[in-house]
Amino acid sequence: MKFTFVTLFDNLVKGYFQDSILKRAIDKELLSIDYLDPREFSDSKHKKVDDTAVGGGAGMVMNPQPLYDALDSLKKEDEDVHIIFLTPVAKPFRQNDAKRLAKRSHIAFVSGRYEGIDERVIEKYADEVFSIGDYILTGGELASLVICDSVSRNIEGVLGNSDSLSVESFETPLLEAPSFSKPKLYDDTSVPSEYLKGNHSKIRSLKLALSECKTKFFRPEQLLKHTTRKSYEK
């Protein structure tokens, strides 16, 4: 899988791939990372990439010319590239999107800055547009990394243990059950006794009950999906 980050600030992105799981995936050639700076495509004397908003409004907007030329260059290099824009004015990114996108060969993330990107760029080049939540960031780079990370861990070989994927939150309607480590007793608090007895059937039952409790508290709408699924399966 190749990821291309179309960004004015590639240093914000590069550091994320210097350690841990994604670094190992790059070393194993499961992932490759590239960067494209719209400034390099600006036809203005001072490599300007933004301008005031037409129709009024605060702040500057990324203007179309540098992005048109940058994305044309990207598509000329690889016509199968899947271009994703990040903006809070979009559908929310979900786990199912991560699994689906993991089957792609090349994804490009276009990160906005200032007050956003000229809408004509999005209309012309976007294969998909995502939001990662109902809040505002100073730029799209963090949102791009969130999606890149989520997609990457669904690519075969990136995670050391493929079983990790099947038991995570959002693989089913329920949130994942709580996890515990050693020591068994710490700060006068013990790991649940059923976890210690080795009865895997009872452990599974307890984990299911804990998952349902956690889901009811944090994400009650997910619990409704779980209840509906169980009724349908009957």
Q: Model-found features: residue ranges?
A:
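Glycine-rich, flexible N-terminal cofactor/catalytic loop recognition
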Residues: 2-40
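Hydrophobic/aromatic beta-strand patches that form the interior of the parallel beta-sheet core
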Residues: 4-6, 34-36, 82-84, 107-108, ...
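SAM-dependent methyltransferases
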Residues: 183-234
